[in-house]
């Protein structure tokens, strides 16, 4: 058992009233990997992370973090795991240097060492100029960065990030991504991150698992999952649904799979670009006039649609919903 | 004890609490004092009210002192302990308030993710609260001195009364702390520190115990606060009456141990993983 692995076997979290927040989840995170745990709100992402980080107990099942059992060896897990939770828990009247120094000392560092480490980390997350300002006066992005620094104080081997970019503006989000990559590449940290952004999972993760309604729907490398859908697709939009249906029956034999999403016919096939002339000819033959025709690489959204039969939550809507909650916090 | 003072690396199992417990406790206490210093609004009103009580009681009843007390005895020294006890009770809420604050802003969970001892999470705010209680008591004693207080036991009398105030308030802190840990609610916690306020009046508040009669006398005799009050009065008015002081200490112990038993139980409730 490698020390930087996460092994989860048949993990279940049941709340009163027979609600299964996490329902028989198993997965493996390899040492030195960035593992994206993707799912819509309420899918069970945070519940999983609270169990893996020793804040709550599984109803049943097993989990090992860095070779330690999260149920019986919680104290050891806390030593090697760094955790940045979705709700940033920082005392608003304290200052960044104080919080980081205390955190270091609680992990057993001497006062001198933890001050040194704190300054190093403040430099790293670009907060060195703001050490005199109480954390309550920080912007959302600054607090998120400080929280990340808090998680890194004791040089963890495995880092847990629960929705690290939710509520952040695009620039801050890119900053967090760059930092996550750096920690993974330069420090060899295993990183487990949950996200509700498809783009983020796609961009950062070596491997992902999609969780929906407490169950893992699919697991694998983003590229592999997308490739599994039949590589690319040609999307032909028509003025109405009957026309799209007609086109599908005419074209379905030419492709791997044809699917109708509203008035758009999606044709999944290998080397889709080569097939465009044939598709256009066939449509001409039948005198079916498309409104538009596009070629797309599959996205994780398509993967999600395929494995769950529903579209992923609209990202924009989600950010807007989240924003006021963030402001209150 | 020698093991603690040796700076040699400890085995991994020992390292799970990296820092010696007493260092964790001092650090948590310091942290809470920093927070209290930056949010003084939660401490100042209780202090003002206690000083206000002292003025009012003294002004309204000191004229009757010749009749209530022995000749030449000061009503100020007689009523001062009431003010001190009410300050202890209102100051006892401080620890609970600051625990609830950490629970609400999420910092409590953050601390639970570190190897910090659970006992340090409880003792930090409680000891910070004790420092505040000592400060409050000292301020009230200072004001009383300006008003003409001359304790029968001199300077040591001040110290003894201060120690009583801190012990009583720290004991009572257990109640607000328990409510804070069990409910995580600020409203419930501030309510808890007022729950025992009636105890300061179900006793020989304004007149000596012998002047009471009927149900109030019975209530006062059962109320442990009465014995704390009498110990303080003896120290300020008459001198080192060890019997009264002994009863006072027993009363303080009873008033402190019960809340802290509950507080330890609540701490376990809050920090046990569910």
Where are these regions (language model features)?
Chain A
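Walker A (P-loop) phosphate-binding loop of ABC-type ATPase nucleotide-binding domains
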Residues: 40-44
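ABC transporter nucleotide-binding domain
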Residues: 178-270, 294
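Conserved catalytic motifs of ABC-family nucleotide-binding domains
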Residues: 155
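Catalytic Walker B motif of ABC-type/P-loop ATPase nucleotide-binding domains
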Residues: 159-162
């Amino acid at each position: 058992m490698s020390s930087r692995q996460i092994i989860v076997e048949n993990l279940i979290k049941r709340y009163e009233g027979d609600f299964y927040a996490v329902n028989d989840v198993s997965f493996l995170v390899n040492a030195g990997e960035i593992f994206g745990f993707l799912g819509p709100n309420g899918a069970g992402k945070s519940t999983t992370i609270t169990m893996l980080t020793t804040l709550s107990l599984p109803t049943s099942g097993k989990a090992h973090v860095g070779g330690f059992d999260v149920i019986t060896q919680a104290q050891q897990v806390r030593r090697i795991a760094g955790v940045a939770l979705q709700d940033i828990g920082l005392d608003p009247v304290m200052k960044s240097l104080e919080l980081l120094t205390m955190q270091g000392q609680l992990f057993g560092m001497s006062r001198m060492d933890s001050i040194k480490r704190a300054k190093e980390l403040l430099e790293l997350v670009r907060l060195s100029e703001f050490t005199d300002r109480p954390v309550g006066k920080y912007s959302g992005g600054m607090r998120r960065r400080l929280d990340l620094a808090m998680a890194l104080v004791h040089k963890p081997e495995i880092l847990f990030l629960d929705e690290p970019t939710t509520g952040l503006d695009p620039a801050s989000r890119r900053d967090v991504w760059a930092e996550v990559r750096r920690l993974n590449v330069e420090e060899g940290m295993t990183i487990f991150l949950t996200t509700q952004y498809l783009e983020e999972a796609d961009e950062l993760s070596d491997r992902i698992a999609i969780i929906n309604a407490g169950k893992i729907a699919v697991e694998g490398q983003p590229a592999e999952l997308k490739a599994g859908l039949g590589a690319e697709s040609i999307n032909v939009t028509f003025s109405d649904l009957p026309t799209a249906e007609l086109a599908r029956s005419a074209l379905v034999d030419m492709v791997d799979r044809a699917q109708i999403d509203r008035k758009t016919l999606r044709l999944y096939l290998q080397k889709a670009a080569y097939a465009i002339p044939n598709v256009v000819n066939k449509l001409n033959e039948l005198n079916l006039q498309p409104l538009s025709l596009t070629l797309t690489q599959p996205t994780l959204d398509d993967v999600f649609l395929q494995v769950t039969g529903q579209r992923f939550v609209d990202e924009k809507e989600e950010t807007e919903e989240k924003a006021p909650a963030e402001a209150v916090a | 004890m020698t093991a603690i003072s040796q700076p040699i690396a400890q085995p991994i199992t020992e390292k799970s609490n990296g820092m010696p417990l007493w260092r964790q406790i001092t650090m948590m206490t310091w942290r809470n004092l920093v927070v209290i210093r930056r949010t003084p609004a939660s401490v100042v009103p209780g202090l003002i009210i206690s000083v206000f009580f002292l003025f009012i009681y003294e002004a309204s009843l000191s004229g009757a002192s010749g009749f209530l007390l022995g000749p030449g005895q000061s009503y100020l020294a007689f009523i001062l302990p009431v003010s001190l006890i009410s300050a202890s009770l209102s100051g006892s809420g401080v620890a609970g308030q600051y625990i609830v604050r950490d629970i609400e802003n999420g910092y409590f969970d953050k601390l639970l993710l570190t190897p910090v001892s659970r006992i340090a999470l409880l003792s930090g705010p409680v000891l910070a609260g004790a420092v505040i209680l000592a400060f409050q008591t000292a301020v009230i004693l200072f004001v009383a001195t300006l008003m003409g207080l001359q304790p029968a036991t001199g300077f040591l009398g001040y110290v003894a009364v201060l120690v009583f105030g801190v012990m009583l308030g720290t004991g009572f802190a257990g109640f607000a702390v328990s409510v804070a840990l069990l409910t995580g609610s600020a409203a419930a916690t501030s309510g808890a520190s007022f729950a025992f306020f009636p105890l300061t009046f179900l006793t020989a508040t304004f007149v000596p115990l012998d002047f009471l009669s009927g149900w109030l006398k019975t209530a006062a005799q059962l109320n442990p606060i009465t014995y704390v009050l009498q110990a303080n009065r003896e120290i300020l008015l008459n001198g080192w009456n060890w019997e009264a002081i002994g009863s006072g200490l027993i009363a303080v112990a009873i008033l402190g141990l019960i809340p802290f038993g509950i507080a330890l139980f609540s701490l376990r409730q809050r920090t046990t993983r569910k």
